[in-house]
């Protein structure tokens, strides 16, 4: 347990083969201190339930993460428990193709949720089982883009249940097909609490200008800018503006190791290369 640690520009893959002996909530990369910085990394093909849980007030920026939590149920890619949320800054990440939550401000099932003051912005999430799970209160969730397969959950969940949750949170300038205050229920039945204005978000539950994916230039080739004249463009919502060009992940080219040579290694042998 220590403070102000930095993990940057690193590539993690094919890890947690058994997901045994992992600490806490079953986490791939875990830190129990505070003010850790995890940025410009790539993670994929992991086994543990949660991928990143790096202590109080984490900064998680410019990472690309996919194909996670393959050996355990539940879980999230970026996981924050209640005490960890204050001062958290989760931004400019690409999170995709996983059946886990993308970014989760977590808390107890029922009872009092004391999670407060996390900021989640300018993230792109696609083909994720619920892109954002916002539990607690006084959070700011803005300029995120969520689209694609949702595994029967809402894309952005600003949770309000049992009469409590997010009454003072701000949710604005997001683009998603399904935004609500419930895991699966509609916006009509479960409207978002706190600072939420329909005209300052694109929510497929109430907007009828096509899916978020259809309004992006070329999302599966990582061009998440809005098409000119689309509703997302006209409202200036989502993670990218027309001229934005930020990229998540490492700043160097990763080339995987070559497979070992099969067969005889002696070039003078009669059976060489057979």
What does each of the following model-derived ranges do?
Residues 1-51, 55-65:
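Right-handed parallel beta-helix
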Residues 3, 34-35, 56-59, 86, ...:
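Short "repeat-start/strand-capping" segments in structured domains, especially the N-termini
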Residues 95, 105-107, 111-223:
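Predominantly extracellular beta-rich ligand-binding scaffolds that present long acidic/polar faces
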